[in-house]
From Swiss-Prot:
Key words of the record: Cytoplasm, Methyltransferase, rRNA processing, S-adenosyl-L-methionine, Transferase
Family as reported in the entry's similarity comment: Belongs to the RNA methyltransferase RlmH family.
GO cellular component, one term: cytoplasm
PANTHER family found in the cross-reference section: METHYLTRANSFERASE, RIBOSOMAL RNA LARGE SUBUNIT METHYLTRANSFERASE H
First-tier enzyme category under EC: transferase
Protein name (Swiss-Prot/TrEMBL): Ribosomal RNA large subunit methyltransferase H
Organism of this sequence: Streptococcus pyogenes serotype M18 (strain MGAS8232)
Length: 159
């Protein structure tokens, strides 16, 4: 199984890179994990609605090029479904049973995701109503993907 994480923006903070690197290493026992960082668009200080839509549209074009035609796509969005780690683990296991070989997660930039990406997604997922920096969300999501594999394995990692 392959797990892709498509992210808008470059990760700069060393502690986040180190954390993600650790979980990538751990995930290598269960799947081929790939994190794809895409360039984000610069947002003007006084951007209006139309400016923001144009920025998200440009970012969506970059994202769309990285999504495989047969990928099962989960986009992170505040309006997405929320569920406990056990259910997330079942979801990941179930995707492979349905015949998908690649699960692609998408984390948008600071403005979020364009509607075209949300429509392409097989599922919208949310980690709650809290606003988190999208760079931090990469680490949280990577840990949860690892946790999902550990739950499936029956490991005491998830207590």
């Amino acid at each position: 199984m392959k797990v892709k994480l498509i992210c808008v923006g470059k990760l700069k903070e060393r502690y986040l890179k180190d954390g993600i690197s650790e979980y990538q290493k751990r995930l290598s026992r269960f799947c081929q994990f790939e994190m794809i960082e895409l360039t984000d668009e610069r947002t003007p200080d006084k951007a209006n609605f139309a400016d923001n839509q144009l920025i998200m549209s440009k970012e969506a074009q970059r994202i769309h090029k990285k999504i495989g035609e047969r990928d099962f796509v989960i986009a992170l969005a505040i309006e997405g479904k929320q569920f406990p780690s056990e259910t997330f683990s079942e979801l990941i296991s179930g995707v492979t049973v349905k015949g998908y070989s690649t699960i692609t997660f998408i984390i948008g930039g600071s403005l979020g995701l364009d509607s075209i990406i949300k429509k392409r997604a097989d599922m919208l997922m949310s980690f709650g109503l809290l606003t988190l920096p999208h760079q931090l969300m990469r680490l949280v999501l990577t840990e949860q993907i690892y946790r999902a594999f550990m739950i499936t394995k029956g490991s005491p990692y998830h207590k």
